[in-house]
Amino acid sequence: MKDRNTMTTIAVVGLGYVGLPLVVEFGKHSRTIGFDIDAAKVAACQAGHDPSREISDEQMRLAQHAEYSADALE
């Protein structure tokens, strides 16, 4: 696996029914930042839970390179 500093970074805007599955799948292989303005949704994702319950906690855990933020400056 590549070092985090040389790994490709992917950003996905919106953690809804389209964005979150993308973050989870890409996050299994590359650093992926999921951004959403809903801080509660971001907090749930950071805790390893999909607020819409479409993605299992196990799938969320497998996305080891996924990060979640409500701060556009990160």
Protein language model annotation of sequence segments:
Residues 2-74:
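Structural/interface elements that position substrates and couple domains in central-metabolism enzymes
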